[in-house]
């Protein structure tokens, strides 16, 4: 986002001043360079760290069966799609995965996208435009917000989980088409949206409901089928977006919906039409990933156990975990500098937990986003808890 660049002159010195300003406000972002696969223990710059910052919730990103399936897919399909899905880039592997995803999520059709960001952009811009209305939770993922702005529909945002305000907005809207957009599991808070109530409002006010289940797919519901299965709800109004690089362990995203919605996306979603298809070997590997997700009840049970343990370990701290029953456990410090200080203190102890600051989260809510994986052990969580308590004492 370039909002805070508005007052900066279009010169190299202007950009340097902007970057200095970000550093002064404890908002500068840095990248880590991993030298190992994703796992509870990773190597960065030659040092091993215990990591709590990946979205690899089921520990599949380095699973031997997925690695074998990926190699098998590369042998069968090569390493690149070569062109877009609508030219000659749509392979049998893509097609089989779309059919499997539709069946797994209990929708008539599914459509692959390269990323969740592109999937959300494709859906919102294909289905809405000038004269239409989009309604979104203020804590939605940036991709949903950007998609709504790109569509040129009127965007109304409601306070987090404030369905009374959403209902007033829906009731007052004269738009010909209405679309409610929401995270199913909020990526920085870890809480789950009240999907039955959201759906009821969409039914009452004749709106579509786009759910971004990037952090629920594979984790929630029977066999990991996601947030809809968690609540046991379905409706032709629902447009379901799931990602394939988090719990699924590989890469990509998909949209599942009614036949007419999917066909409209194929015809009109620019982020689907005007891009090269993902390598087909990824889709081949993801077919195996779906099998592992469906059979991963033990992994999901372990996640629940680790989540309960982490809450116990963090209970004595001055900082509080936000209420969340998902693997996303945010420990809120408030000030940017303090979140960075605690993150760095953990790093000195060989533990990686990312500090999340504005604009990713609202001002005054900087936090550590602790992310659990079923690959973590009980001892890993206890080590993190002990380190946090020691840092807490040292900062008194």
Curated annotation (Swiss-Prot):
Entry-linked Gene3D superfamilies: Aspartate Aminotransferase, domain 1, Type I PLP-dependent aspartate aminotransferase-like (Major domain)
Residues binding substrate: 29, 141, 360
Entry binding sites for pyridoxal 5'-phosphate: 116-117, 187, 215, 243
Protein name in UniProt: 8-amino-7-oxononanoate synthase
Catalysis performed (reactions): 6-carboxyhexanoyl-[ACP] + L-alanine + H(+) = (8S)-8-amino-7-oxononanoate + holo-[ACP] + CO2
Function summary: Catalyzes the decarboxylative condensation of pimeloyl-[acyl-carrier protein] and L-alanine to produce 8-amino-7-oxononanoate (AON), [acyl-carrier protein], and carbon dioxide.
Assigned EC number: 2.3.1.47
GO biological process, one term: biotin biosynthetic process
Domain of life: Bacteria
Alphabetical list of Pfam families matching this protein: Aminotran_1_2
Cofactor: pyridoxal 5'-phosphate
Family in the record: Belongs to the class-II pyridoxal-phosphate-dependent aminotransferase family. BioF subfamily.
Gene Ontology MF term list: 8-amino-7-oxononanoate synthase activity; pyridoxal phosphate binding
Modified residues (N6-(pyridoxal phosphate)lysine): 246
InterPro entries: Aminotransferase_I/II_large (IPR004839), AON_synthase_class-II (IPR050087), AONS_Archaea/Proteobacteria (IPR004723), AONS_Proteobacteria (IPR022834), PyrdxlP-dep_Trfase (IPR015424), PyrdxlP-dep_Trfase_major (IPR015421), PyrdxlP-dep_Trfase_small (IPR015422)
HAMAP family: BioF_aminotrans_2
Assembly and binders: Homodimer.
Alphabetical keyword list: Biotin biosynthesis, Pyridoxal phosphate, Transferase
Pathway the protein contributes to: Cofactor biosynthesis; biotin biosynthesis
Enzyme class: transferase
């Amino acid at each position: 986002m370039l909002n805070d660049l508005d007052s900066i002159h279009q010169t190299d010195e202007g950009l340097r001043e902007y970057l200095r300003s970000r550093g002064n406000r404890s908002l500068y972002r840095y990248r880590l360079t991993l030298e190992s696969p994703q796992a509870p223990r990773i190597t960065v710059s030659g040092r091993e760290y215990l990591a709590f910052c990946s979205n690899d919730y089921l520990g599949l990103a380095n699973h031997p069966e997925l690695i074998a399936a990926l190699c098998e897919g590369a042998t069968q399909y090569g390493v690149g799609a070569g062109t877009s899905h609508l030219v000659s880039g749509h392979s049998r592997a893509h097609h089989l995965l779309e059919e499997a995803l539709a069946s797994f999520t209990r929708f008539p059709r599914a459509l692959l996208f390269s990323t969740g960001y592109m999937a959300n952009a494709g859906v919102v811009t294909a289905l809405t435009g000038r004269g239409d209305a989009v309604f979104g939770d203020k804590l939605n993922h940036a991709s949903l917000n950007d998609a709504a702005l790109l569509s040129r529909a009127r965007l109304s945002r409601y306070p987090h989980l404030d369905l009374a305000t959403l209902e007033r907005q829906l009731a007052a809207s004269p738009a010909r088409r209405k679309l409610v957009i929401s995270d199913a599991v909020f990526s920085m808070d870890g809480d789950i949206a009240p999907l039955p109530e959201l759906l009821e409002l969409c039914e009452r006010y004749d709106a579509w409901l786009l759910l971004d289940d990037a952090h629920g797919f594979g984790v929630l519901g029977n066999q990991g089928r996601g947030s809809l299965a968690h609540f046991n709800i379905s409706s032709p109004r629902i447009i379901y977006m799931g990602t394939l690089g988090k719990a699924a362990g590989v890469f990509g995203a998909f949209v599942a919906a009614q036949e007419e919605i999917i066909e409209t996306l194929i015809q009109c979603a620019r982020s689907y039409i005007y891009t090269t298809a993902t390598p087909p070997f990824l889709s081949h590997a993801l077919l195996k990933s779906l099998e592992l997700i469906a059979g991963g009840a033990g992994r999901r049970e372990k996640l629940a156990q680790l989540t309960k343990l982490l809450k116990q370990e963090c209970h004595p701290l001055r900082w509080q975990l936000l209420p969340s029953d998902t693997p996303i456990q945010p420990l809120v410090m408030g000030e940017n500098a303090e979140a960075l200080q605690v993150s760095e203190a953990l790093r000195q102890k060989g533990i990686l937990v990312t500090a999340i600051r504005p604009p990713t989260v609202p001002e005054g809510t900087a936090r550590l986003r602790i992310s659990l994986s079923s690959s973590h052990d009980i001892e890993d969580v206890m080590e993190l808890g002990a380190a946090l308590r020691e840092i807490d004492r040292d900062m008194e």
